[in-house]
């Protein structure tokens, strides 16, 4: 039975474990894109902040570009529907925000770092107390809560309790004119007059509005709008002299606050006289001398009731109805300071965020700096281009600027928050740098370029392929239809198409399946669903530009009996292929040509080598190799077997036949007898025992085609002999067949490997064509689909990531990653070196692989111990590149040497990300990154060269994660919090509770003085662990206090450490204080701690959690907040596990070294 015991193998050394912690760390950093299922919107005109709530309980706060804060509600009754954020209300100018959930729970949030922390919670019970509206006082001390029962409660924001008086609806009814005899219904809107803060405008559901005087607790004036059905809301002007009242029948009117009589246009319906839908939100302002009314809804119910519109009506007669393709959630209008002059309209839709310039009569669109809709058309593939050169990046920007000429140049109005000095300095220092560009392929045939180098995901270019295909007549008709649809008849609502979200695609064959992009030359290749490969580049200044070229390659033309039963190929427009046609250069991109692969099956993989002018594409039927410089085919190979061609045979099966299974059973019986009879065959020892492996189930016959090409790779490596590198193309299929093709390049392409071409379309000087031949073929025995191939050099760097002319340091090694295992081979012998069976050991399957670069600063002592390590590790300074013999000991400003290491990153079908060393394939990190149920997130994940990853956490959002400690991109902006007045008392109580257990008078005075001087908010005190520096080293205390103040002159060092801090432990210890035991020359083992602080030598030491190192700060964002922890005014201690090591060195001339470990457990309540 010992052979079934897993062998532990060789364990990493202590130095290696230290280095692993310095190199690898998993954390979720930033979120890009548009929030999934938004449900609420709020704007703070004082702090210039915007907040969005979602149906999943998320809250996102945005200020100036770079300021982003995230929060997440927690389950109350284990019902996800209760997480829906229904209302958001800012406490103006303080940075705090209130949220109301579907569970009728009111929560006060406060920004701490880059997160929002819930500090107060108030639940409401009963149907009559169902909250319908919120209004925060301009004095920042009260919140008025309107309910569906018609009552208004006052919430004291300092104590977060309901206080008197309550404005009951029956009290209000007693003071309104007797002509109003209805039950007023729910509170629809509450507004405080800006010129008279003791007066409230209250709008009830059934056509009643009152002006309430809070000093006298009486109705000062009543406004009755009969005949309009339900009221919806109010909008008060900046001077507090008039208000706009809008209703559910599509009407609105402007009332004077000093006059209760209805205005003359009280029956005005903008889109009447037909019955109209409700106006959901309305703002009124001015543009010069003209009044501007902005409202959502109000469409004629029968004709245009299904339109999602926001209308802008100006008193000079100009009207625009912005017609969106998704539901309008909410919107707001920004004004100039202290006036009613409108500036910007910001509309939150179900699928996107749109902004418009209201100062311009043409109401131009504004390009927002964030919250872009990644899924304007459904995303079909992702490609992440790392280390894009600045020259290529600038060319993409110039092309994108040509597309942005129709946008307004007005400044973005949301400018709240403060950017830290680090983020500002880094932007100024890095003048020349590499960029990270995310390319998303879409269902409509477009490819969008996103700059994801920093926290902001900025759209920089949109490449469209749909205009190439189709006939000319259809294309012209579509263009005419788009122009005519801009405006309808004058008698109808003046519709204008608005927004970018377009979920519909004219032709599913246009969908982009694979993308290849060269970060050094800017060459772009796009593969589609119908076997089309579009070749383009960003060099529009080339002199030899010609008309669009077209070519096709048939994979099964020489095979008899094959019948393609799928969709037809796309037709290139005939006018583009004429000899006198102008070059297809649009918006800064030159489209060179189109390659059509036949049969027109979907492109399953692509590889691009711009220096050689080659592109290779794979389908379910085989692969093609194409020379796009000369635009001629080079090579094609069909991977189908005869059974697949005729359809008579089944797909490749991994099930054993009955004859083979019976034969193996008899062999096992014979082998078992011989083993029992042979005493020399002993059971291996524990160290030699093989690990227990899961049985790999045979794949069923309905698996994917074994002929499908899964991955392609261009590499210049050692194939024929050990001394000379040769250009090669590697391919792999679903049936574990790896083929190596030797490429014969003419002199021009060979020279291009040493000198990069100036553009992607420079034709070769020689007339000799490129040729390819099959050199080697590898058949893996387990026959699992191959998901990735990579060739790396001695330092572990992939050779395909090198610049032109660099081959890497020999020897080269080949990594083949199938769904079940990794295998490393030597080159050119192709001898197995190492392997890692993931499915057998872990039960997971490999989905994606990538090589990443990891680096950190290390001490010279650690450097010496690493000199004898793996050859794939190196130590280098800032100015050195990747290569062999690149080991140096250059120290930068005394911070240590820059240690560099290449590693293999792997994503599994369980959503886990593993980091493995190469070529040893030893696991360095394993993190659960994506939920295993999130199939879309797992399939969309892509890695960068610096150990980062992006995946789609929803159909519209991207989550960024970091695996390296040296490259972490996360929001650095903060929101300054204005302290509440009542926090002085709470802070004093915190200090007093600490003084009760402290007998050192001087220390007490220092604590009290510090607290009284700073007066920090309670939430800031409670969340101080969030302000940790993840790179801080361990803190060493001498006798628990500083060296200079130590009363004990003996040379004793006490180091206190706490075990692994997890999210669960920190959740229970948000306000934990750890107490260190102080000792002199006598020690004893302490079984438990019965007091909150221990005194020795008349000195008590308290260490806050900020002194505890190695806390993963971004993981604290996922903490489930406890409402009861925010209600207490004392600081309690909870110690789970404290390990105290006391080390005695030479004392009083005696040489002695004694170590005592004390483990203490204590539990207390908050």
From Swiss-Prot:
> Known PROSITE patterns for this protein?
WD_REPEATS_1
State which gene encodes it.
l(2)gl
Q: What does this protein do?
A: Essential for the development of polarized epithelia, for cell polarity associated with asymmetric cell division of neuroblasts during development, and for oocyte polarity formation. Promotes the formation of actin-rich projections at the oocyte cortex and the posterior enrichment of par-1 which is required for oocyte polarization. Regulates the localization of axis-specifying morphogens such as stau and grk. Could act as a tumor suppressor.
What species is this protein from?
Drosophila pseudoobscura pseudoobscura (Fruit fly)
Upper classification of the organism: Eukaryota, Metazoa, Ecdysozoa, Arthropoda, Hexapoda
- GO CC annotations on file: cortical actin cytoskeleton; extracellular region; plasma membrane
Give disulfide pairs as residue numbers.
none
Name the UniProt record assigns to this protein = Lethal(2) giant larvae protein
Q: Does the keyword Cell membrane apply?
A: yes
Q: Where is this region: Disordered?
A: 867-888, 975-1002, 1144-1166
């Amino acid at each position: 039975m010992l052979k079934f015991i897993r062998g532990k193998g060789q364990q990493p050394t202590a130095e290696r474990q230290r280095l692993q912690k310095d190199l690898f760390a998993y954390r979720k950093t930033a979120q890009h894109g548009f929030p999934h299922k938004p449900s609420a919107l709020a704007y703070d005109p004082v702090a210039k902040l915007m907040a969005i709530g979602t149906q999943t309980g998320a809250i996102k706060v945005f200020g100036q570009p770079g300021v982003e804060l995230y929060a997440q509600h927690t389950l109350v009754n284990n019902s996800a529907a209760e997480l829906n954020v229904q209302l958001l209300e800012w406490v103006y100018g303080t940075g705090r925000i209130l949220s109301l959930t579907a569970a009728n729970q009111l929560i006060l949030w406060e920004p701490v770092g880059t997160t929002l922390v819930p500090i107060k919670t108030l639940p409401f019970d009963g149907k009559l107390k169902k909250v319908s509206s919120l209004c925060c006082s301009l004095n920042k001390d009260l919140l008025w809560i309107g309910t569906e029962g018609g009552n208004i409660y006052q919430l004291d924001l300092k104590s977060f309790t309901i206080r008197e008086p309550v404005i009951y609806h029956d009290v209000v009814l007693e003071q309104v004119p007797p002509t109003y005899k209805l039950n007023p219904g729910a509170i629809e809107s509450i507004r405080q007059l800006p010129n008279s803060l003791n007066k409230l405008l209250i709008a009830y559901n059934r056509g009643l509005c009152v002006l309430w005087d809070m000093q006298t607790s009486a109705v000062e004036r009543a406004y009755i709008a009969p005949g309009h059905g339900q009221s919806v809301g109010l909008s008060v002007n900046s001077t507090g002299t008039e208000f706009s009242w809008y209703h559910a029948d599509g009407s609105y009117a402007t009332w004077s606050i000093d006059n209760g009589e209805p205005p003359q246009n009280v029956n005005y319906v903008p889109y009447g006289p037909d019955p109209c839908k409700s106006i959901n939100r309305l703002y009124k302002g001015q543009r010069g001398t003209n009044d501007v009314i902005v409202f959502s809804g109000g469409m004629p119910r029968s004709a245009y009731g299904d339109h999602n519109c926001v209308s802008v009506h100006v008193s000079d007669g100009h009207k625009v109805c912005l017609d969106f393709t998704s539901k309008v959630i909410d919107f707001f209008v920004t004004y100039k300071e202290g006036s009613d002059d409108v500036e910007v309209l910001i509309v939150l839709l179900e699928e996107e965020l749109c902004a418009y310039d209201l100062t311009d009569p043409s109401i131009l669109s504004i390009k927002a700096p964030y919250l872009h809709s990644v899924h304007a058309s459904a995303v079909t593939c992702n490609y992440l281009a790392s280390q894009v050169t600045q020259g290529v990046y600038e060319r993409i920007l110039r092309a994108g600027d040509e597309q942005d000429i129709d946008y307004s140049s007005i400044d973005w109005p949301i400018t709240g928050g403060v950017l830290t000095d680090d983020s500002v300095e880094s932007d100024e220092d890095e003048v020349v740098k590499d960029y990270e560009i995310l390319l998303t392929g879409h269902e409509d045939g477009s490819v969008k370029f996103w700059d994801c180098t920093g926290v902001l995901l900025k759209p920089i270019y949109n490449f469209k392929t749909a205009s190439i295909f189709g006939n000319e007549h259809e294309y012209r008709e579509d263009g005419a239809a788009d122009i005519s649809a801009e405006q309808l008849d004058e008698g109808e609502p003046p519709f204008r198409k608005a927004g970018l979200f377009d979920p519909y695609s004219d032709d599913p064959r246009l969908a982009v399946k694979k993308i290849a992009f060269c970060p050094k030359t800017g060459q772009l290749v796009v593969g589609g669903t119908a076997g089309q490969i579009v070749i383009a580049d960003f060099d529009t200044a080339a002199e030899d530009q010609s008309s669009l070229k077209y070519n096709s390659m048939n994979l099964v033309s020489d095979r008899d009996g094959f019948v393609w039963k799928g969709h037809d190929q796309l037709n290139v427009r005939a006018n583009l292929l004429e000899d006198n046609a102008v070059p297809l250069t649009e918006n800064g991109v030159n489209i060179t040509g189109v390659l059509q692969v036949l049969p027109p099956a979907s492109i399953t993989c692509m590889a691009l080598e711009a220096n050689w002018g080659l592109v290779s594409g794979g389908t379910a039927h085989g692969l093609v190799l194409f020379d796009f410089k000369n635009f001629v085919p080079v090579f094609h190979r069909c991977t189908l077997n005869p059974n697949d061609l005729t359809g008579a045979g089944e797909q490749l099966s991994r099930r054993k036949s009955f004859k083979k299974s019976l034969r193996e059973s008899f062999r096992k019986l014979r082998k078992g007898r011989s083993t029992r009879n042979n005493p020399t065959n002993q059971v291996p020892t524990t160290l030699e025992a093989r690990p227990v492996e899961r049985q790999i189930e045979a794949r069923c016959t309905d698996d994917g085609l074994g002929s499908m090409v899964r991955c392609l790779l261009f590499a210049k490596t050692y194939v024929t002999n050990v001394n000379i590198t040769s250009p090669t193309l590697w391919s792999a299929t679903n049936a574990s067949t790896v083929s190596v093709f030797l490429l014969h390049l003419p002199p021009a392409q060979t020279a291009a490997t040493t000198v990069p071409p100036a553009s992607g379309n420079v034709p070769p000087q020689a007339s000799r064509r490129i040729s390819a031949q099959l050199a080697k073929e590898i058949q893996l025995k387990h026959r699992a689909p191959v998901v990735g191939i990579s060739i790396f050099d001695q330092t572990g760097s992939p050779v395909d990531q090198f610049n032109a002319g660099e081959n890497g340091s020999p020897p080269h090694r080949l990594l083949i990653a199938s769904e079940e295992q990794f295998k490393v081979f030597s080159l050119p012998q192709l001898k197995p070196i190492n392997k890692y069976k993931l499915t057998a050991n872990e039960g997971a399957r490999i989905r994606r692989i990538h090589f990443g670069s990891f680096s950190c600063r290390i001490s010279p002592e650690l450097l010496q111990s690493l000199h004898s390590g793996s050859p794939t590790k190196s130590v280098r300074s800032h100015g050195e590149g990747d290569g062999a013999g690149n080991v140096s000991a250059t120290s930068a400003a005394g911070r240590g040497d820059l240690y560099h290491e290449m590693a293999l990153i792997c994503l599994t079908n369980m959503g886990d990300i593993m980091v493995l060393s190469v070529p040893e394939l030893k696991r360095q990190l394993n993190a659960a990154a994506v939920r295993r149920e999130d199939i879309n997130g797992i399939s969309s994940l892509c890695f960068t060269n610096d150990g980062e990853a992006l995946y789609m956490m929803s159909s519209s959002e991207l989550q960024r994660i970091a695996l390296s400690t040296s490259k972490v991109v996360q929001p650095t902006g903060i929101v300054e919090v204005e302290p509440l007045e009542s926090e002085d008392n709470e802070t004093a109580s915190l200090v007093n509770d600490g003084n009760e257990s402290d007998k050192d008078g001087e220390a007490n005075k220092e604590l009290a003085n510090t607290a009284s001087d700073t007066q920090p908010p309670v939430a800031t005190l409670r969340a101080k662990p969030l302000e940790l520096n993840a790179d801080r080293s361990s803190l060493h205390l001498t006798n628990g206090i500083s060296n200079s103040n130590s009363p004990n002159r003996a040379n004793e060092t006490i180091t206190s450490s706490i075990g692994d801090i997890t999210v669960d432990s920190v959740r229970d210890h948000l306000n934990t204080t750890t107490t260190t035991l102080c000792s002199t020359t006598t020690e004893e083992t302490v079984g438990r701690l019965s007091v909150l602080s221990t005194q020795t030598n008349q000195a008590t030491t308290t260490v806050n959690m900020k002194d505890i190192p190695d806390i993963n700060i971004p993981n604290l964002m996922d903490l489930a907040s406890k409402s009861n922890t925010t209600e207490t005014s004392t600081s309690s201690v909870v110690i789970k596990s404290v390990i105290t090591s006391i080390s005695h060195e030479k004392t009083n001339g005696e040489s002695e070294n004694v170590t005592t470990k004390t483990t203490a457990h204590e539990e207390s309540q908050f």
